[in-house]
Amino acid sequence: MAKFLEKTADGTYIVSAPSYRVAVHGHTFDVYVAENRFCTLDVRTAVPQTSEALEEIPDRETRLPTLADVAEKAGEVTFTWVGESSLWEKKTYVLRCGFLRFNYTVTVAGHGNVDGVRYFAGEGNGSPYEFSEGFTPCVSWYNEEDYRFRASMNCHRWSVLMVPPMFSYSFGMRGVGDRLSLGLVAERGEHNFHAFDYRVVRNSWGSGFYLATDQSGHTHVDGTWTAPAIIGYGAANEDDALRKYTDYYFTSGIAKPHDHRPFPRFWYGPMLCGWLEQAMRVGDPAFANLTITELAREELYEALVGKLAGYDMHPTALIIDDKWQSHYATDEADPTKWKDLRAFVDRRHAEGIHTMLWFKLWDPDGWDPALCVTTDNGEMRIDPSTPEFLANLDRALYRILSADAGCYDCDGFKLDFAFYNPIGRRVKTHSGKYGVELLYDMMAYIYKKAKKIKPDALVNCSPCHPYFAHICDQARLHDYDPKNRDNREDLEMRGRMFSLAMPGVLLDTDNSGFNTHRDTMRWQMDQAMIGVPDLYALMGNESCPLTDEDFLAISAMWKEYARKIDLLRGMEQ
């Protein structure tokens, strides 16, 4: 490796690390990976504000920033630029280069509400790039947008499948094997955004890019504020880029890994969830005129469990899905659907089956509108930070998990609809938290309270980010678009993303599409290769006819999987 820091005759500073090299000149720095220049980053980063009218106020540099200091110590070089802008009295840009990565930050001084951060936007034309394609670890709803995108196209992902995703891009260049990775890293309490976008700007004969967040006015500055950092490094491939991103979150102390003590046996499954059974029983004469959510009832689930016995199938966990409760906000069993939920749970315990309840986040059904927030689209959402809602959560969690008289004695939750997280400048929460941070606070509260009531309770949820690793027992791979015909490959890819984000967290392989026989059975029979097998229905449909032999085949796979888990757990113990 070349000398770590060199200065050329023309005043350029060159830092050479094992996976990358930067060349600092003026207010820009070239980034090289595998001896190829991937981009030239302009340190100027716009930090627009939100006006009282809830509109964006542009942030413009009034002069070029000047390189004020270059400091070297063992294994690290720090470059500091100083500038100012139309909105901020002072802006300080810092680039720290180490052996493993570089770390870039912008600190603003002044007053105002941050609308977003436009990293490397320069004077508005972005930063020049040579890479040709990018990868984002987030697939959009129903795969309308892929993980990969052309460098000439903007990339914004709003996903219901990974909430939140890892905020990291890796970029590839034609003819070069290695990749450049640029990831967003926020300190604890500073994830007050929803998105991390890649944007392209055409300028004259060229084009540039920048990276953007959406604080939407929910970060108030009265003095100084340092925006979330960008870390950069070279990577061998897409997975390597994400692994390094996750490693930084853990080793920096921002994120905590999951406690890897031996998990309760029932966490490993197999599992049965009734959601698609509810969907396919709509119109069934046995449940005349009942909607899909009205079918989350005792008669259907009792019949489902009885049908399991006929196939000699023995799940360790049963998930009662949407909508077993009277109201989403208060989570009390609907007496018109459940004569005695506790008695149902007790019967399952006697059979070795642990009952989990589907739990909808954010929905204001049954909650006081005065304690809710309104999105920019005019939709109402629960504010989970109010004392009133936290007290309501305490009551609901106790009622669901406790074995005390009058409680349900259930064994965990399937937390869903995390993507309902309220978005927009109009959202005003009691705590002032927003975006990822607001979701984190709610999920952390649920997790800690649940474990206090029942330490073995299983929390199944959807985050695909290391920040959430210690409050997620089992990550759900989520819905599969039945129009597709690659069930195994789709969910296998998601499984890789979740495992990279939260090492050691169990994977709920979730549902098959029940779209065609081949696509469905490929995934059902191979789920154990990825995670915990999960079956969503014990019947087929006209598009996907399933026979008794099919379910007996799944039963055989379940038995072999269960034996394997028991053997492995025996070896661990």
Task: Explain the meaning of each model-derived region.
Residues 312-324, 393-429:
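Active-site groove signature of glycoside hydrolases
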Residues 573:
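Carbohydrate-binding surface patches
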Residues 247-250, 292-307, 336-343, 390-395, ...:
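Well-ordered, non-membrane alpha-helical segments in soluble/globular domains
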Residues 273-298, 323-339, 375-395, 423-439, ...:
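The substrate-binding groove and active-site-proximal loops of carbohydrate-active enzymes
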Residues 4-8, 13-316, 412:
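Carbohydrate-recognition beta-sandwich/jelly-roll modules
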Residues 282-299, 341-346, 353-408, 419, ...:
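Active-site-adjacent "subsite" loops/lids of carbohydrate-active enzymes
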Residues 253-279, 319, 339-378, 456-461, ...:
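Glycine-rich, aromatic-flanked loop segments that form ligand/cofactor-binding clefts
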Residues 365-379, 383-391, 395, 440-552, ...:
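Glycan-recognition surfaces
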